[in-house]
A protein has these predicted regions:
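Active-site hotspot residues in diverse enzymes, especially metal/ion-binding acidic/histidine motifs
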Residues: 1-166
Length: 166
């Protein structure tokens, strides 16, 4: 099977390659530094604005990484404040940032290098520990990855069909 990457997966891989990171062991501080993002820790809800990401230091390192990736998307790709935006547009931006976080925290190009355990529960724990994310986040990311594999297999099967049923 030739895994078909999505544009987001390609974009995340290119981001990491441009900053010289190819393994999952880099800290968010190092990633922020290489991206030119200022990272601050304050005892308040996390947010981002104009190249600065503020994280709550009292959350777990796994939650901070997930939040960092979510806020990174807002910093890089969204402008202005969400306060005056229509509700549906704000929801769209939040969905985009969350989807990006799944791929940024557990990049496909790094995930593909791993030999995942045969049992799904063990694979989830392995992903969570390898990429420093929560088990729930790893479970959802694995589901996203599996759906892309299924889509690739479906595409290959359709492409190999001699004729379409009529």
């Amino acid at each position: 099977m030739n895994y078909i990457t999505t544009p987001l997966e390609d974009h995340v891989a290119n981001m990491y390659y441009k900053i010289g990171i190819s393994e999952p062991d880099s800290s968010i501080e190092e990633i922020a530094r290489r991206l030119g993002i200022v990272l601050l820790y304050r005892k308040k809800p996390s947010f981002s604005m104009e190249g600065v990401i503020t994280l709550n230091p009292f959350t777990s390192k796994e939650v901070r990484k997930i939040t960092f990736a979510h806020e990174l998307y807002h910093t890089l790709y969204h402008v202005g404040t969400q306060i005056d935006m229509p509700h549906l547009f704000r929801q769209l931006q939040e969905w985009q940032a969350t989807n990006f976080a799944y791929h940024f925290c557990v990049p496909t190009f790094m995930l593909q290098k791993l030999k995942l355990p045969a049992y799904r529960s063990e694979a989830i724990t392995f992903i969570a520990e390898t990429f420093c994310v929560t088990n729930q986040f790893a479970k959802e990311r694995l589901t996203i990855y599996e759906k892309q594999i299924i889509g690739t297999l479906f595409h290959e099967r359709l492409s190999s069909s001699k004729e379409l049923p009529g």
